[in-house]
């Protein structure tokens, strides 16, 4: 649901915001941080505008993985989650992520609310009991989830594959289909064993989910994806057998709530804890008739839980559903999946040991949009953009003019030299607010930096450093520099959701109270400021390289209990930049093709269907993942490069007969490679 920025009024909006709960079995890394920084920026914007916006989160503290991790570390699960929670809170605080309440799912509030949601759904007839067969570890005396079973893929015969899908060939299967399965917990051969489990009757909510997923509460890409699930809704297993770290289900001794039942209820529990402390009404936000706004920020990997199970469970329990769920993509580094061997699997603490959190907050903001596209952290671009935008543009305004104000008495003039420039910056405020509201942070940053460019051009044209040497020009210099400081102040207000610490330093320099969005309507005239001190240092690529090196060193060597699987061997080869022979390269046949027709693909988030004219080779049908970057009408008539001898691939939407070459990390940052004019369809690319 997209909401236009609401004009500031005397009646603030009541907003509750959550981020997905980080799992309490390991440290925060940069892939996690994208979501928390995105959410924090949006929340800070709302608060800066005077809204009553509450941001809660918690550690996801239950499950088999935490129980086993605690056992591995020689501590109790309670000790394990307490230490991890402290580490998480420290990392979030140092990245300036400001929760109103940070809690744990292992809490009395979460137990009570989980039992309430379960019992209400049970009373309404939405809980089933079914006897099923599962794999069981006879050595550990426990049932095994799919991801705790490994073996040889039944399709491609790759070893050491998980019990639900093969990472080498992509095949999906059941754990029972694995060849030579073994428990990744003990190494024992699992056996099949019957067990009676509890299920949430999700198919009963099909009509509700069809309506709700198309109500505007989800991004279009997410809503389209969830339709695939809705076509085949199945009862959802919500119980696990002992031994298990979590909450035992009342009336079912030895059975525990599955972590994905009590984890989202953790949002409610953290808010309940906040309400008890602050004297707020829980029902005002979660009751069926609540008029408060409720937003969940999540990653695209958990949209099924939040977009299907969660609203259905809430409805079954007589509670309200979210106003909207905002999903984001995965983080890549330098165009590739985060890699421990390359040092790009960067922990939050390792980053903080080398670089300012403000750099990452700004870079995330500068590239984030409201879409679900993956996010590439290109480290060279990261350094260049921070240095250019923040140091070279924003801070430069104050550094070039602040000391001239001090030189001529330290007080800003009562009249400005260029009111047209100042009004231009003020009038941009509503547009920037609208971008923030719609999570189009990248557009907001581009607008702000364009204004900073205008200010720097103005300063360069006026050259106060030259005028200051001329006798009798003091008041003119002061008016020029006062104009620049007023523009700087406005830009700081607009950037405050992204850079709260820099804003605080700027407020100290300007000697003003903490700025709010409403302050953008006023000017700073006849006001004394402090001596300018550097507000931000430049990114040094040596710091970045040192961070990457430390990320490599901090990665423990993998256990050698099993031979390397095929996927790992392939990854190692890629890490070593393995070369190929010219004969290998010549096997790939590249041809010039012209896009005869381009069209959207119904039900596909990323694909366009291209009909390509390949000269004497005839026409080819190709599905290309370029929808985020190109409209169909932009492509028709365009020359492209086609991999012409790629085996046809059967896809859900049809047969793809080749691949179009493109550059870039993906999403809306992708660029089709196009031959020079003169090339003709069918020509071979050499």
Curated annotation (Swiss-Prot):
EC annotation from Swiss-Prot or TrEMBL: 6.1.1.10
Residues where Zn(2+) binds: 153, 156, 166, 169
UniProt-listed Pfam families: Anticodon_3 (PF19303), tRNA-synt_1g (PF09334), tRNA_bind (PF01588)
One GO cellular component term noted in the UniProt record for this chain: cytosol
Cofactor note: Binds 1 zinc ion per subunit.
Localization: Cytoplasm
Entry superkingdom: Bacteria
Annotated tRNA-binding domain residues: 584-686
Region (Disordered): 547-573
GO BP annotation list: methionyl-tRNA aminoacylation
Role noted for this protein: Is required not only for elongation of protein synthesis but also for the initiation of all mRNA translation through initiator tRNA(fMet) aminoacylation.
Family: Belongs to the class-I aminoacyl-tRNA synthetase family. MetG type 1 subfamily.
Protein name listed in UniProt: Methionine--tRNA ligase
Protein source organism: Alcanivorax borkumensis (strain ATCC 700651 / DSM 11573 / NCIMB 13689 / SK2)
Lineage of the species this protein comes from: Bacteria, Pseudomonadati, Pseudomonadota, Gammaproteobacteria, Oceanospirillales
Gene: metG
């Amino acid at each position: 649901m997209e909401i236009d920025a609401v004009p500031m009024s005397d009646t603030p909006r009541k907003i509750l915001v959550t981020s997905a709960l980080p799992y309490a079995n390991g440290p925060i890394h940069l892939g996690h941080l994208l979501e928390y920084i995105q959410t924090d920026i949006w929340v800070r914007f709302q608060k800066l505008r005077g809204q009553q916006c509450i941001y809660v989160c918690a550690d996801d503290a239950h499950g088999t993985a935490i129980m086993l991790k605690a056992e591995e570390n020689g501590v109790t699960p309670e000790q394990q989650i307490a230490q991890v929670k402290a580490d998480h809170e420290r990392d979030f605080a140092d990245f300036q992520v400001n929760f109103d309440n940070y809690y744990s799912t292992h809490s009395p509030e979460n137990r009570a609310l989980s039992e309430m949601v379960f019992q209400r759904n049970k009373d309404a007839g939405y809980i089933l009991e079914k006897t099923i067969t599962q794999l069981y570890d006879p050595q550990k005396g426990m049932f095994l989830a799919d991801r705790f079973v490994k073996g040889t893929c039944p399709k491609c015969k790759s070893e050491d594959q998980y019990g639900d899908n093969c990472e080498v060939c992509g095949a999906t299967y059941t754990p029972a289909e694995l060849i030579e399965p073994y428990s990744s917990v003990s190494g024992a051969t699992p056996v099949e064993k019957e067990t009676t489990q509890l299920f949430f009757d999700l198919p009963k909510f099909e009509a509700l989910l069809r309506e709700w997923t198309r109500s505007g509460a989800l991004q279009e890409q997410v809503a389209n994806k969830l339709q695939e699930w809705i076509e085949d809704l199945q009862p959802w297993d919500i119980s696990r057998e002992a031994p298990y770290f979590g909450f035992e289900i009342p009336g079912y001794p030895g059975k525990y709530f599955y972590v994905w039942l009590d984890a989202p209820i953790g949002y409610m529990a953290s808010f309940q804890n906040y309400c008890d402390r602050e004297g707020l009404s829980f029902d005002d936000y979660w009751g069926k008739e609540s008029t408060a706004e409720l937003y969940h920020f999540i990653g695209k990997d958990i949209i099924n839980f939040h977009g299907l199970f969660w609203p259905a469970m809430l409805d079954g329990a007589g509670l309200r559903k979210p106003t909207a769920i905002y999903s984001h993509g995965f983080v890549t580094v330098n165009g590739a999946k985060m890699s421990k061997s390359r040092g790009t699997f960067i922990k939050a603490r390792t980053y903080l040991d080398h670089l300012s959190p403000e750099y990452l907050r700004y870079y995330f903001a500068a590239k984030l949009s409201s879409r679900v596209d993956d996010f590439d952290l290109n480290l060279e671009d990261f350094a260049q953009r921070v240095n250019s935008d923040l140091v070279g543009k924003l801070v430069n305004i104050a550094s070039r003019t602040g000391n001239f104000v001090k030189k001529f008495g330290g007080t800003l003039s009562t009249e400005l030299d260029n009111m047209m420039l100042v009004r231009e910056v003020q009038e941009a405020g509503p547009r920037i607010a609208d971008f923030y509201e719609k999570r189009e942070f990248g557009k907001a940053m581009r607008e702000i930096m364009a204004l900073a460019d205008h200010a720097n051009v103005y300063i360069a044209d006026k050259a106060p450093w030259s005028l200051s040497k001329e006798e009798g020009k003091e008041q003119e210099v002061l008016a020029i520099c006062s104009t620049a400081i007023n523009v700087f102040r406005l830009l700081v207000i607009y950037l405050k959701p992204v850079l709260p610490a820099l804003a605080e330093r700027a407020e100290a320099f300007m000697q003003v109270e903490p700025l709010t969005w409403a302050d953008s309507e006023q000017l700073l005239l006849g006001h004394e400021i402090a001596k300018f001190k550097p507000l931000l240092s430049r990114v040094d690529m040596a710091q970045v390289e040192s961070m990457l090196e430390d990320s490599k060193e901090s990665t423990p060597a993998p256990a050698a209990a099993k031979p390397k699987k095929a996927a790992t061997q392939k990854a190692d080869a890629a890490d070593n930049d393995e070369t190929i022979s010219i004969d290998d390269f010549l096997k790939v046949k590249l041809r010039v093709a012209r896009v005869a027709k381009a069209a959207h693909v119904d039900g596909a988030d990323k694909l366009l269907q291209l009909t390509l004219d390949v000269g004497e080779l005839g026409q080819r049908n190709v599905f290309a993942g370029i929808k985020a970057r190109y409209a169909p009408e932009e492509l028709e008539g365009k020359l492209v490069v086609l991999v012409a001898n790629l085996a046809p691939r059967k896809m859900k939407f049809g047969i793809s007969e080749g691949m179009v070459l493109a550059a870039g990390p993906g999403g809306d940052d992708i660029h089709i490679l196009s031959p020079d004019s003169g090339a003709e369809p069918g020509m071979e690319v050499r």
